[in-house]
Amino acid sequence: MIQIDTIPKELQSIQPFVRRFNELEAHNPVIAYWSLYWAAQMALSSSHGVSNECKDFLLSLIEHLEDLRKNLGENENVSDETSAKAYVESFSLEVLVQAERNSKNGKPDVQAYLAARDFLELSRIWGPPTEQITKSIKFCKLRALQVANPQRKAKTPSNHATEELQQSSTNSTTLPTQEAAVETNASASHETSFALPTTSPAASLSISPTKSAAVSSEPNVEADVKSLSSTPAAPQLNSPSHSYEPTTFPSTTSITENLPTIDPTRSTRSSSHIQSLSPESKQTSDGHRPPSPTSITTTSTSIDPSVAFSSKSTLATTRTNAPLSRPSQPTKASPLNKFSALEAIQSARSHARYAYSALDYEDTTTAIHHLKSALKLLEEEEQGNHTAD
């Protein structure tokens, strides 16, 4: 591990990459190696005219890099240029994809976007980055600024993440198109503190917090950050991705009690009987239908469905708080001897179903009444059979 505070002031621009090296040295030595390699290359490019302190630090950095290279041996993601570039870009894009997932899940992390930015910068080792990598780098900076903006209002200026963002720069706010991350080379997969996306939806990105701010080597930092912060087209992380409207419920005064009916929250066992309770399916032998339950609005009692089947029943006067929508005339049921045995059994079944439905509402009085009516029909039908015999 390289102590950040030992980096000379003239080489502060390499801090982010030294920090990534410290974070991944024990978990992903390949990415750690390339992070330190890029830090050394940046330091060498700016070593002209530096102090002896900087030269000593640079020599120790190169020695550390050589030791790490020996430990990696013949790893193709280090020895082979094409494989190394593909592996670094794949890892970088995976970190960015995971940062976006966390943001969409309501857990945006500034450090996740900053880490993705640093890893994407490593592609410069093999020449100018592609257009997609360039857009992804700018996208990381923009997203990090969007996450940090509300935090900067509540935190002191000494906040390290805010300081690092203020030193980041960009010349464009063009967002990259969504592309799937390149699959990581299986031969060089390592356990890493940056949890890579997997098939499991519970995969998460864990980035160790840093203790100091990174200094960008790009010019006009403050102006670029200001332009990023005021970009009108920038998406807001904190805004909800979906809009839900409250469910509209009907007024309780407009609900009519239709007995018997099945509460939609009841079990499927009880709901299976509702289809057989339709009044249109029940008809007496003289052509009269039982009064429809939906034609009556009541708050205290209900019309007895047995009037269509009983030989002695008449329509009882009910106490209601609302007028009858269609007054029913008292019906005279046909004598039982005009019923066929099949019709009597069917009528008894209807009473039993009404009783069953009434029990769903714990209306034992109605249930008992219909059960008695069903038993009476069956007893009279049985008595008629004995008489005929």
Curated annotation (Swiss-Prot):
Primary location: cytoplasm
Feature: compositional bias, Low complexity: 294-306
Membrane topology recorded in Swiss-Prot or TrEMBL: Peripheral membrane protein
GO cellular component: endosome membrane; multivesicular body
Keyword entries, A-Z: Cytoplasm, Endosome, Lipid transport, Membrane, Protein transport, Transport
Keyword Lipid metabolism on entry: no
Biased composition (Polar residues): 156-177, 184-219, 227-282, 308-334
Start and end residues of each stretch annotated as Disordered: 149-335
Pfam families tied to this protein: Vta1 (PF04652), Vta1_C (PF18097)
Location within or outside the cell: Cytoplasm; Endosome membrane
Top-rank taxon, per record: Eukaryota
GO biological process assignments: late endosome to vacuole transport via multivesicular body sorting pathway; lipid transport; protein transport
Subunit structure of this chain's protein: Homodimer (in cytoplasm).
Sequence similarity: Belongs to the VTA1 family.
Function: Has a role in the formation of the multivesicular body (MVB). Required for the sorting of lipids to form intralumenal vesicles and for fluid-phase transport to the vacuole. Required for sorting several plasma membrane proteins into the MVB.
Name of the protein: Vacuolar protein sorting-associated protein vts1
Lineage summary: Eukaryota, Fungi, Dikarya, Ascomycota, Taphrinomycotina
